[in-house]
Amino acid sequence: MSMAQSETVAFYFDPICPWAWRAADWIREVRQVRPVEVEWRFFSLEEVNKGDKTVDWEGGRSAPALRVLALVRRQHGNDAVDRLYAALGQARFVRNEELSNPAVIEQALASAGLDPGLRAAALADASTRDEVLREHYAVVEHMEAFGVPTLVLDGGRGPGIFGPVINPVPRGEEAGQLWDRLVWLMRQPGFYEIKRTRPQPRH
């Protein structure tokens, strides 16, 4: 294992986003090879796109799932959010189920070892919506976040980036090496942006 400095990273996600799902898979891998703690934070792509009439959210709304995640964190903590997010991702991206379906959320809760009744409780509690939006707009204000995955170092108080956008997900030491390089880059005061035009160069 690398002797890298311990880090706490705030990982902002929307459970409807496949890129955030892959990055979450990666950051879980990083935890196995680097001294990293992950704080799971909420970001609403629906809120970002609410004025865009070209976006059809009917089959892919994530607001109910985010509200359930907020109540789960309040009652059971960060580790339970991790488990539920993983279960929701399995439903959405492995089994191609819609997170707007109440039964899908309840099954994910059960798979995460949580009470399926938390879905109805979260949607009956208006403060869960407030909590999601408060967290969403806090990172928008802090670093002008616009999408997910968004990573912010120092438990959400330090420098941040949009990304990484990765496919396939690196494993083992390769995951750790990507983390090392990203953290180094994020902590460079002059760094602003980097973007790859395509996965592989044309020959």
Which residues does each PLM region occupy?
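Extreme N-terminal starter segment of soluble prokaryotic enzymes
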Residues: A4-A10
